[in-house]
Amino acid sequence: MGTFRTYTLKIQGNDITLKNITIENNSARLGQAVALHTEGDRLVFVGCRFIGHQDTVYTGMAGTRLYFKDCYICGTTDFIFGPSTAWFEGCTIESLINSYVTAASTPQDQAFGYEPMSHWRLSKLPWHHPHCDYSRKKLK
């Protein structure tokens, strides 16, 4: 089936806000299982829960901007991945196994990748597994 066709929810529009919703991909831990697949700019997620195993949240297009506030994201391997710029404020990120949390594929000409902001809570390390030479992440 392939990673990019396993999503529970795919967003292809711009300027969309989701609040207090749970998006879960409950397929078995046998491969990729995307809960959220984004292909829009200026997407906002507030108080949402994203639950899956490998590849839970796909930040799917270079040059797009995503903002996660007070969200819960859990998974197993590289469960936040893709080329978008994404800010995470007050989010709880839970790794269900001792593996990499993110796999950014930030393009060389894009200034930012994944940006944890204030009140960042990460349950386990390691944080970042780059998917290309220019992957960017920032820890505060």
Model-derived segments and spans:
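Sequence-level preference for short, compositionally simple segments enriched
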Residues: M1-K140
